[in-house]
């Protein structure tokens, strides 16, 4: 949505200073062992914002050692009441509310995110996620089991231990809290590696974590690159679990490293090529808008993007016309500027990849309805692009684009569209638009997706589990299921003289 459509959004901060640029270990700020730093940029202007300490294997080792020490039996963190963990998470949410404007401005400057979206959606989601996780802290519990014989048996839900958490660049702060919220609620300690493109809000969170009162070593933040710092976390022999959100290609490397090291637990939220199916009986206005937001939100840089749009033949032409009309309404520019409705892609690498895929669509015979190229003289901007007459064998129909590119395909029958929708390596999410409840239930059951939305799209909440089928990953984040990823179940059996019912 455009900034002008959003109510109650203050102006972003000006002359923002980036105070926290070092590595956060044991509630203290450290320079990198190597002495190296790396630059952080504004993708809208291509200007350097600051330099950040570049963590690598030696820094990860220090962070893991601190996390392990904080997790020792008898430590302040391990002996803390579960309800107190919840209080600390709520305190952290309070501090995010206090720094709401600063963090939203930082997300827009560093991540190219529309300021209004950062302020309302991302920061709002961050606060709700933490409060949800805080509420679970003293409700993660075991059971008693009526085992045969004279025994008393019960289970304990114990924290996994030291958790490595590798964060993507598209939702830097929200994904940071999706990771640390459940982990800390369950009593784990964490070593977090933010994406090298967007480390600034994560590092600011280090200061808030210390201010909230978390003991030293419970949360450690090591900015750095994937092949060095990320690889060190994935292969570390003293990391008990790693959680990663990002590309399927990197997810495979992380799982391989986990298997070759200590068989640490792994949860992965990876890529997607999500189908969105619009039947002829759907509310067309609703379907057009949700499908549009489903692929163009945050410049298309969403793992759940509705990037394969299947429209029933009888309404296809009208749907394409309305979709093109909607895409042409975008105003591109600096995401901090009021009235702008589309910002830049995150960096040059993504920018060039998207433009290459757009060119492939043109060459392979898709009809370019609008957009189709770069925009402006500075920054990584790409025109909102709509293709029609797309076929399933085209690259734009198969590969994850991660950009503002909508491809619209035609279908004739229910059985045909189910088969085509499932014909992908991915299985993260899907959408269905129909006013026929029988059709909605039938199709949602048939789709191989971790999440299916009916007559809506991209509706995500802390109360609901999120994750993918197939090569979109494994494990779940958030909801009650998400906490299982951060606990181990221990069975305790005690011999007693006599058991009574």
Curated annotation (Swiss-Prot):
Phosphoserine modified-residue sites: 413
Gene: ALDH1A1
Keyword hit for Nucleotide-binding: no
EC number: 1.2.1.19, 1.2.1.28, 1.2.1.3, 1.2.1.36
Domain of life the protein comes from: Eukaryota
Chain positions found as Phosphothreonine: 337
Chain positions with N6-acetyllysine modification: 91, 128, 252, 353, 367, 410, 419, 495
Keywords recorded for this protein, A-Z: Acetylation, Cell projection, Cytoplasm, Lipid metabolism, NAD, Oxidoreductase, Phosphoprotein
Residue ranges the record marks as coiled coil: none
One Pfam entry name: Aldedh
Chain positions covered by the region annotation Mediates interaction with PRMT3: 336-501
Subunit-level organization: Homotetramer. Interacts with PRMT3; the interaction is direct, inhibits ALDH1A1 aldehyde dehydrogenase activity and is independent of the methyltransferase activity of PRMT3.
Annotated site residues (Transition state stabilizer) in this chain: 170
Active site per the UniProt annotation: 269 (proton acceptor), 303 (nucleophile)
Record InterPro entries: Ald_DH/histidinol_DH, Ald_DH_C, Ald_DH_CS_CYS, Ald_DH_CS_GLU, Ald_DH_N, Aldehyde_DH_dom
Known role: Cytosolic dehydrogenase that catalyzes the irreversible oxidation of a wide range of aldehydes to their corresponding carboxylic acid. Functions downstream of retinol dehydrogenases and catalyzes the oxidation of retinaldehyde into retinoic acid, the second step in the oxidation of retinol/vitamin A into retinoic acid. This pathway is crucial to control the levels of retinol and retinoic acid, two important molecules which excess can be teratogenic and cytotoxic.
Species whose genome carries this gene: Bos taurus (Bovine)
Modified residues (N-acetylserine): 2
Record-given protein name: Aldehyde dehydrogenase 1A1
């Amino acid at each position: 949505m455009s900034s002008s459509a959003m109510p109650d959004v203050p102006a972003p901060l000006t002359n923002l200073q980036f105070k926290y640029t070092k590595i956060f270990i044991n509630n203290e700020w450290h320079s990198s062992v190597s002495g190296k730093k790396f630059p952080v940029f504004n993708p809208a202007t291509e200007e350097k914002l600051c330099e950040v300490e570049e963590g690598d294997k030696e820094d990860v080792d220090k962070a893991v050692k601190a996390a392990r020490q904080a997790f020792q039996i008898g430590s302040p963190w391990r002996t803390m009441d579960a309800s107190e963990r919840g209080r600390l998470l709520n305190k952290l949410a309070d501090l995010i509310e206090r720094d709401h404007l600063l963090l939203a401005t930082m997300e827009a400057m560093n991540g190219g995110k529309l300021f209004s979206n950062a302020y309302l959606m991302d920061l709002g989601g961050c606060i709700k996620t933490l409060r949800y996780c805080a509420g679970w802290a003293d409700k993660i519990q075991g059971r008693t089991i009526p085992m045969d014989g004279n025994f008393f048996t019960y289970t304990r839900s114990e924290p996994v231990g030291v958790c490595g958490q590798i964060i993507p660049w598209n939702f830097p702060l929200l994904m940071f809290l999706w990771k640390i919220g459940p982990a800390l609620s369950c009593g784990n300690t964490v070593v977090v590696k933010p994406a090298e493109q967007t480390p600034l809000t994560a590092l600011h969170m280090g200061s808030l974590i210390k201010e909230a009162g978390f003991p030293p070593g419970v949360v450690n933040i090591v900015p750095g690159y994937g092949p060095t710092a990320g690889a060190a976390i994935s292969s570390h022999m003293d990391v008990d679990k790693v959680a990663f959100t990002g590309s399927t290609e990197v997810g495979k490397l992380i799982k391989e490293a986990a298997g070759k090291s200590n068989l640490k637990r792994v949860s992965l939220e990876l890529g997607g090529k999500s189908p969105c199916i619009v039947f002829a009986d759907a509310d067309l206005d609703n379907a057009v808008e949700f499908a549009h937001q489903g692929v163009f939100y945050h410049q298309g840089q969403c793992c759940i993007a509705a990037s394969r749009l299947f429209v029933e033949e009888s309404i296809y032409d009208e749907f394409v016309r309305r979709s093109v009309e909607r895409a042409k309404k975008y105003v591109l520019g600096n995401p901090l500027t009021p009235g702008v409705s589309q910002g830049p892609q995150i960096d040059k690498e993504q920018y060039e990849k998207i433009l290459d895929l757009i060119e492939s669509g043109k060459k392979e015979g898709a009809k370019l309805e609008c957009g189709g190229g770069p925009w402006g003289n500075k920054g990584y901007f790409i025109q909102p692009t709509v293709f029609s007459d797309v076929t399933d064998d085209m690259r734009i129909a198969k590969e994850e684009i991660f950009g503002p590119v909508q491809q619209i395909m035609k279908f004739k029958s229910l059985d045909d569209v189910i088969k085509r929708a499932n014909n992908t390596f991915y299985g993260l999410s899907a959408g269905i638009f129909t006013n026929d409840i029988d059709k909605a239930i039938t199709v949602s059951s048939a789709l191989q997706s971790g999440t299916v939305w009916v007559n809506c799209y991209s509706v995500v909440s802390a109360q609901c589990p999120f994750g993918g089928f197939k090569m979109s990953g494994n494990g779940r984040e958030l909801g009650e299921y998400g906490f299982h990823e951060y606990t181990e179940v221990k069975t305790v059996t005690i011999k007693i003289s006599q058991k009574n019912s």
